Amino acid sequence: MRDARPGGELDYIGGIRGFERRLVANHPMRGQLRYHELVVRSLRSAGLSVHSVLDPARLAASVPQAWWMLGRLRPAALFTTGGYLAMPLVLAARARSIPTLVWEGNVQPGRATRAIGRFATRVAVSFPPTLAAFPGNSFVSGTPIRSFDGIDRAAARHSFGLDPGDRLLVVFGGSQAVARMNAAVARALPQLVADWHVLHLAGDDGMADAGAARQALPDALRLRYTAEPFLTDRMADALVAADLVVGRAGSSTCAELAAVGVPSILVPYPYAGAHQRYNARYLVNEGAAVEIPDDELTSERLLAETEALLHDHRRHAMADAARRLGRPHAARMLADELVALAEGGPLPSTVPS
């Protein structure tokens, strides 16, 4: 937004849990973001419970508050990624004739996004199959990700101590249920390092076990295994350097794998509405990844899948397929669309390319 509309004012509306406030307080653009709190309780899954009665009441009570807030802020446009805050804000924005852009990051939309999509001006989605859930007002933007511009693969590989003929396997589980992935890597490690250099992002809680697994390796193989808790500042370099990635299937992970063009073995997080399972299957169906269900992730299965991808020609075909799915400039596309909505100009998403 800073580049698409220099000098524009940005207001961030968050909830009462405090997470959003901390997010804004720690953001590099915090001096340009004004935080506002909307008192809305999270809505629960509908069912035969007290929440099936309370949720509609909570929603109805929150719409006037959202109406008042938008009347005070008078935004030119509203952007939301869904969630429990989105419904009252989108309803209030529609009533006030404020254009709204909703973004859905997963192949299978969440309940809130499905509901508010009917009231939004435009709905941006990360994956083409999601268009069917929002007929008439949706377009494919991709997922906003970090920039990979200017990263040289040879230089990135050199920074991790790789020789030209080495294969780099990068393993990471994000913040969700990484213990199962760590255990599979630890048991498979002696065989893995025979074929790959392994960069394993084990999380803070996994570092002790990763260190023990490294010490158990023969001296000649220890240099082929590197464990780190996280790799925030060098993650882009790691993905560019990688020959194969083992990871979860969140929207951002899938988008970054596609932007870089790296083949992957995806282990979808099995909870949170099973969104990651649908994301993974899209990449699998497009030939860019293989999938291991979370409950089938064992050292034996991990070894079988990595060994099947030792051959360069199969990995190269998967890399090409991933690259065809990449939308590395999604953030700018969303920003341009939002500015056009705010200014009443032609929408970039409707202009033929």
Q: Regions from the language model: what does each represent?
A:
Residues A4, Q32, R94-A154:
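Active-site-proximal region of nucleotide-activated glycan assembly enzymes
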Residues G150-L162, R314:
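A short helix/loop element that forms part of the nucleotide-sugar donor recognition site in Leloir-type
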Residues I292-P293, L297-R314:
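C-terminal "capping" alpha-helix adjacent to the active site of nucleotide-linked donor transferases
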Residues R327-S353:
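C-terminal alpha-helical cap of glycosyltransferases
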